[in-house]
Amino acid sequence: MKQPARTSQVKKPAARVKRKTREEINQEARDRKREKKHSGHASGSRANPATVSQKGDKSQSVKDPRIGSKKAIALGTDAPVRQPANPVKAAKPAVEKKPRLTPEEELAKLENDERLDALLDRLENGEALSAEDQAWLDQSLDRIDVLMEQLGIALDDDAEDEKAEEDMYRLLKGSHRTPE
């Protein structure tokens, strides 16, 4: 098969662009440099800012862009105390902070807790506890263990003390026999 001839492939000569001379290129570069030099703010623009007129706020004084205040502050003790324009409202105590209990007080409080006693009695009687009650009971018992450990109290502390005293007494007496 023969390919059809394409007539659109023939390129037409484009219009020639006139090349700039070296003098024209240099002049354009100088113009760009001159414009670039004057692109910043005018001298003194920070100290004397241009005022932008606003339609609604004509009564408002011009605000100083610099940080700080120009108001005089009385340094003497006889200066009158000024109240702020918007007095600060006292914050409402949403939740009063409970006074922090010492470990001894917290342990005594937990040992005298009626709910804890009732739940322990129910467990001793073989009753099943709800998941919520069981979780609270476990948490309370864990806290009691932590407090007792902090205070150096052990459950069988008394029996060990008596045994240790007997051993010390026998060592001091010179009797090396072991107790029966």
Swiss-Prot record:
Annotated organism of origin: Erwinia tasmaniensis (strain DSM 17950 / CFBP 7177 / CIP 109463 / NCPPB 4357 / Et1/99)
Functional note: A GTPase-activating protein (GAP) that modifies Der/EngA GTPase function. May play a role in ribosome biogenesis.
Biased amino acid composition, Polar residues: 1-10, 45-54
Annotated Basic and acidic residues bias: 21-32, 55-67
Keywords: GTPase activation, Ribosome biogenesis
GO terms classed as biological process: ribosome biogenesis
Signal peptide positions on this chain: none
Amino acid composition bias (Low complexity), ranges on this chain: 84-93
Pfam families on file: YihI (PF04220)
Subunit structure: Interacts with Der.
Source taxon at top rank: Bacteria
InterPro entries: YihI
Sequence segments annotated as region (Disordered): 1-102, 158-180
Name of the protein in question: Der GTPase-activating protein YihI
Chain's gene name: yihI
Entry-linked NCBIfam families: PRK05244.1-1
Family assignment from sequence similarity: Belongs to the YihI family.
Molecular function per GO: GTPase activator activity
